[in-house]
A protein has these predicted regions:
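Conserved glycine-rich cofactor-binding loop
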Residues: 10, 17-18
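The beta1-alpha1 cofactor-binding region of Rossmann-like NAD(H)/NADP(H)-dependent oxidoreductases
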Residues: 43-44, 64-76, 108, 221-223
Length: 253
């Protein structure tokens, strides 16, 4: 993306093997960013993303880590700093629906599983990375939320919606806390995006969503990645504590 200023930055992107995370990694690579690519399940897909980053002119580092595990998150951050010397940008993208369960049938384990993946992971990664940013008086943290945080989610997705709403609250709190240290913190809230996540989470075709989307189409991972890249760049220096929507008009709040 010509025009964005990254000034020799280093980014750590969680959940970078597919979808929005993968597109963000490639976009960062195009801008000359050194990118640490976190994945957990699919090494094959992660390697493909790393190859795309390298082909675009960037530098990549693959790190397998479960972002629900504080110890593995700490080790991931240590490895990134050891390889690149610093971390300027953190994109908390890892997350998922897990499964759709009516609240009256939901057990504690399912609640915890969703919260751990979508919200606790953001806390763990931010806690581990922020000290490195404070020391340099610079940082960009972008958290991937969802339109579900504002619209309640789809069928039997209350816990997913709650976890994504929690991300937005954490984003605002961190933005206040970290602003004096030169660190901005923002959320991106995608709507219906054509990614493997939505392919797994939804039943039926994307056509079912079109009546609720004024633009009459679903979004692409690249469109979300473009916004994340802007928020990660030096050009977004006066934006913090914001939740930015990428949903084709599905939510107009």
């Amino acid at each position: 993306m010509p025009g964005l200023n990254f000034n020799d930055r280093v980014a750590l992107i969680t959940g970078a093997s597919t979808g929005i995370g993968a597109s963000t990694a490639v976009r960062m690579g195009e801008c000359g960013v050194k990118v640490a690519l976190n994945y957990f399940e699919s090494q094959t897909e992660a390697k493909k993303v790393a190859e795309s980053v390298e082909a675009s002119g960037g530098v990549s580092l693959l790190i397998r880590a479960d972002v629900r595990n504080a110890g593995q998150v700490s080790e991931m951050v240590v490895r990134t700093v050891k390889a690149f010397g610093k971390i300027d940008i953190l994109v908390n993208n890892a997350g998922g629906m897990v499964k759709r369960v009516p609240v009256v049938e939901m057990d504690d384990a399912t609640w915890d599983e969703v919260m751990n993946l979508n919200l606790r992971s953001v806390f763990y990664c931010s806690r581990a990375v922020v000290p490195h940013m404070i020391g340099r008086k610079y940082g960009r943290i972008i958290n991937v939320s969802s339109v579900a945080a504002f619209m309640g989610g789809g069928r039997n997705a209350a816990v997913y919606a709650a976890s994504k709403a929690g991300i937005n609250g954490l984003t605002k709190g961190l933005a206040k806390e970290l602003a004096p240290h030169g660190i901005t913190v923002n959320s991106v809230a995608p709507g219906v995006i054509d990614t493997p996540f939505h392919a797994r989470a939804e039943t039926g075709s994307y056509d079912q969503f079109l009546p609720s989307i004024p633009m009459n189409r679903v979004g692409t991972a690249d469109e979300v990645a473009s916004l994340i890249a802007y928020l990660a760049s030096d050009d977004s220096s006066y934006i913090t504590g914001s939740v930015l929507h990428v949903n084709g008009g599905q939510y107009l709040g």
